[in-house]
Amino acid sequence: LQQALDKRGMILNLMYFYQGQDEVFENVDAIRRAVVNATDWLIENNARNVIIEIANEHDIRGWDHDRWIHDNMDKLIELARARFQEKNAGWVLPIGASTGGSMRVFDHVRDHSDLTMIHGNNRTPEEKRSRTAELFADPKMPGPIYMNEDDSGRETTLEVLARELASCDAVFSEGGSWGYMPWRQTQMFPFRHYMPAKTSKLEPGMTLEQSD
């Protein structure tokens, strides 16, 4: 995937940890090793088109290990960054971590990140606009303001599409970048792939296979 994206001039947002899978790690030493191993793989494969997201929604409920990943995010960011120097890479990838719909940025993450990562889930377009403007104007916030996930509704309808487009416009207008999350395609298992419909226009009454 990383190589295919690179050939198309695209960037991979690579998430190391999520609360739904962190139970596979036996202890915090295993978490540290995961950061080292994943980052070393990126370096060894010259994967320069990557943003490292140490943890996705590190502030929400559900994390195991007594929320160790959230509490030690600064150390994990620096651990990943140190691998580039240790390996004499001569280059480094941007590193950060995202919060959920709180759109909050924690000090111990902010002070060690290369960019500011938030989610707009279940927020109105105006709330997203306002928060993006606040972050963009704050000189303490690192790098780009990157809303890399936004859940504006879980059905493929015109109403949800309108909220998605309004959210994109709101974030863009205040200097942020916006990430579309097609919930039905990314959050369901097993993964389902539908061929394109006969028209690119979303219309009421379409079957699920056509609208998705």
Locate predicted features.
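Extracellular glycoside hydrolase catalytic/binding regions
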Residues: 33-34, 39, 49-209
